[in-house]
């Protein structure tokens, strides 16, 4: 997304010197599907024993593939990826572009998820909210919004002398 942001800022600077950006809304107003997943994960964990989660994952493999963005099968697979793990691991797992198996295949070795996501776990544990959704909002604000999204917008806009307000 940094390339598209760069090009957008370049084109915008041709007409204005200050622009209003739209980044950050999902992180502030719980717009991501991961916030819905928190509720579904709790329901699944309360209703279905952990022992049958692998079977559910295999059943999801039967769901037809789709090329559409964030399709039903993808959402189900992501949801199940976080279930059974402590809350501190769920958001990093759901946000990760690849799963544990893909990382292990890439590095040809076993991966400990707590080691892989240690920085995210530390940030999660710093959050003082008790409710999982509120804690996730705080987590997104502290790690994702501050260190990634807004930094990307700031740097790409400043490269073109464009002031972007979020």
Region locations from a protein language model:
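Structural motif
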Residues: 127-140
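A short, charged helix-loop
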Residues: 115-125
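ATP-dependent adenylate-handling active sites, centered on carboxylate activation for C-N bond formation
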Residues: 1-116, 152-166
């Amino acid at each position: 997304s940094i390339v598209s942001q760069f090009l957008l800022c370049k084109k915008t600077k041709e007409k204005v010197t200050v622009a209003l950006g739209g980044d950050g809304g999902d992180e502030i107003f719980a717009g991501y599907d991961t916030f819905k997943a928190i509720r579904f994960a709790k329901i699944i964990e309360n209703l279905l024993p952990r022992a049958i989660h692998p079977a559910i994952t295999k059943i999801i493999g039967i769901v037809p593939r789709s090329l559409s963005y964030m399709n039903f099968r993808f959402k189900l697979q992501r949801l199940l990826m976080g279930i059974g793990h402590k809350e501190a691991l769920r958001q990093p797992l759901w946000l990760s572009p690849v799963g544990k198996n893909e990382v292990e295949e890439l590095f040809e070795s076993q991966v400990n998820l707590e080691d892989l996501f240690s920085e995210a776990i530390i940030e999660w544990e710093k959050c003082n909210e008790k409710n999982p959704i509120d804690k996730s909002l705080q987590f997104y604000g502290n790690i994702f919004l501050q260190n990634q999204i807004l930094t990307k917008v700031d740097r790409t806009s400043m490269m073109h002398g464009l002031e972007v307000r979020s």
